[in-house]
Amino acid sequence: MQAKSGLLKMWHNNVFPHALLIAGSEGVGSFPLALALVQYIFCENKTEFDSCGKCNGCSRAARLEHADLHLSFPSIAPKPGTKPMSRYYIQEFREFVQQSPYGTTYEWLQHINAENKQGNITADECREIIDTLNLKSYEGGKKVLLMWRPEYLGKEGNILLKLIEEPPKDTLMIFVAENLEDILPTILSRTQTVKLGPISAAEIAVALELRSLADGNRAAQIAHIAQGSFTEALRLVRQADNDLFPEVRQLFNAIFTNNGVAIAKFAEEWSKAGREQQKNFLHYVIQLLEQAIRARYMPQGSVALPEAEAQFVQRLAGNKVSFEALQKMVATIADTIFYIERNAHSRTQLHALGIRLVYTVHGHTIPA
């Protein structure tokens, strides 16, 4: 990976930043890169190009168990009367990372049975981080803070500003983020940012085959649809067991027939799901719509999807819906995801979404 080699070069030139922000969209490998850097930092036999992968430092870092590695991530209160703190979930986080190094925040929160609760990195946790990093190193070397998803800091992140700007000696901070726009500008300005691009379809296909998740044409098909996200590729593999397509078809039947009762039912049923489940469903709808947009310029049969979904996409790509309407539908759904992420009332948002999609499909202007 080019980003990793560049960072290792900075290490050997003694210009490695004390506060590094690795940013990349879901599934491009931001956390695996951060973990590889942590392992390199603690490696006892590092070379110019990589960690040895065999020493005690490497093995403990890979398991997130090194005494001088301090972890911070979104969490929830473990029981009433307590506050969300990462230290309550360290073992669960280690297990999660071992199982799902490309895992999402939603998957992590489900792993700790958060249900509909949204994770947080609290002011109390920020103060604990400051206290911890001001202690001496347990093993006499570097101390490393690895914070996954600093977007969940909110305004509480300002508590860390002095620490980020003037860290204790031999202290490094590595932040792993997806959405730079959700991070406080005061934190962004104090870190050096490395942005990761999408993974190539060829790399995703090889990874799926190596893990025996898909082979041959199916691996290539999934890699093409995943659009550079290994997380999306894994989601597509799992969709055979958790098929959302019937729900999508039901929604669009309601939209095309202007069935207000069915749209209200859709909003009511999905409002009972967790916010992350709602977002996953809407992202899936966007994925199908984007495939339909591409299909406008591709020959018949070239859409890389299972048969039922491919037929649905081809119908959308035909004369059923205009190109402009498809684009507007994607933008409308993206807006709904934005508001759901910010705790808007989900049933209201989903009902409004259904109505807006009806207006878009049938070529009407929504009244002001």
Where are these regions (language model features)?
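Clamp-loader machinery-focused feature within the broader ASCE/P-loop NTPase space
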Residues: M1-K155
